[in-house]
Amino acid sequence: MTSKTALLSFTFFTLIASGKKNVIFVLADDMSRDTWGAFGGKDCLTPNIDQLARDGTRFDRAYCTVAMCAPFRQELYSGRSPWRTGTLPNHSKSVRGTKSIVHYLKPLGYRVALLGKSHVGPAECYPFEKLGDVSKQVDANPEIMKKTKTFLDDCKKTENPFCLFIGSHDSHA
């Protein structure tokens, strides 16, 4: 397993809503950072992600402590190392009482949702609004895309800021 396994490509994007910034966080497993055009890639066409990166805020230097799917995702969502959350080895669940970004953003009025690959648990540690797990499906599943559009439209209509994590599975080697 290489250091590229868990996280190598992601874009952090923000918009203004109700005076608070919206957050869209795109991540993919087993994908090199320079695959996406926003980070210099030439082989894959990613015009919409490139625009999000240009117009928003992105991380150009970010690191994970473990290059495995579940430990990394739980580290990202909790801000704590896998040794603290108990998520080693891969496919492990966090220890009870682990707090995630959902616990911190919800009291601030944010809706916090997860679209795509989840690979985290238990649910009380990561109580995302689930928009659909595409880990065994094609990412462009029409039902999931409709659910995501409804989520975004609802946030806009109610002027709720949101934090949306999009976890692709398609890039797995």
What are these model-derived regions, one by one?
Residues M1-T2:
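N-terminal secretory signal peptides that target proteins for export/translocation
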Residues T5-T14:
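Sec-dependent N-terminal signal peptides
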Residues F13-A173:
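Formylglycine-dependent sulfatase
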